[in-house]
Amino acid sequence: MNSEQNNYFFVGTKFGDDDYLEYFRKEGKWELGWHNNEENKQYQKMLKLFNKIKPGDVLFAKSTYVKKNNLPFVKKDDLKVSVMNIRGMATVKEILDDGHTIIVDWKKEYIEREWFFFTGQETIWFPSDITYRTKETNQLIKFAASDEIIIQDYDYFLNHPNWKKYKKLESETMLRNDFLFDYSGILKKSKNLILRGAPGTGKTYLAKEIA
């Protein structure tokens, strides 16, 4: 019996201009890039994280970018916010000894979702390694792993010293109308949509608007 705690890693699926997520899903695997370029310093850095992954751990396919408009909260107009699009979830079954390949079981019908502020751009991001970000990491993992749509606690991040520069002080943080259409589309796919979130994050408002 393995008593080790399972860990959660966020991994990229784009190498250059090519996106391999559908290929990985079809093949039941995920791969770290830099094939035939193992001397690359970035590969060597990622290999250290790769070697931390074990059977039972969870991989989240992600892409990271910035957005200025069409956000689900009010912010200062001139600032761009870091966004992590979480696109898939897989459970690790086996790690091959080639330094690149992990055999996984991809979760079917995973609903893509966007997470803001606390994000990672590396090919392998292990937020649990950031010991002073335990609270943010726990929120992120709960958000990413949920079968249901959870509203991120935007107020928490907008009032956090690291991200409060984005807060528009003269306006109360609220869900934007143009973002509601994204949830309406999700609702069409998931008839058992349940909204969760901390008090004051807009669950009741959102439910009324997409009804």
Question: Could you tell me what each predicted segment is?
Answer:
Residues 195:
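Hydrophobic anchor at the beta1->P-loop junction of P-loop NTPases
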